[in-house]
Amino acid sequence: MLRTLNIKEEEYRRGNMLLELNGLEVDCIIGELPEERVRSQRLVLDVQLDVCDDSAFSDELADTVDYAALADSIRSALIAAECRMIERAAKVVHDICIADQKVRSAKVKVTKSGAIKHLASASATYGIIAGQ
């Protein structure tokens, strides 16, 4: 059965979990227009993490992704990056997520409100979660 699922035996014995951070708000410089380069705008992020950890069995924070710390890292990185495009912001966040060894894959959606007149919001999604 393990070979059929193409999952390493060690990973199978550990827990497989989908963690989601929804509605993470980050105020940062984002956009191409001159006026966007001088004032912060709000981005809203939805992040899915496919993790392989023991937290479902152990009930210990040390056995999973510390999503409070991850949220802080994401916020700091986007503030520092001053991206011009939401597509780039999604990639920046994705790279932070997969740097954690417990994260097998990640999917990041970045939404920017009021990007274009008569449009409620624009969003970009980067990454995949296996099996979705």
Predicted segments, located by residue:
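N-terminal, polar/charged subdomain of small-to-medium soluble alpha/beta proteins
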Residues: 2-132
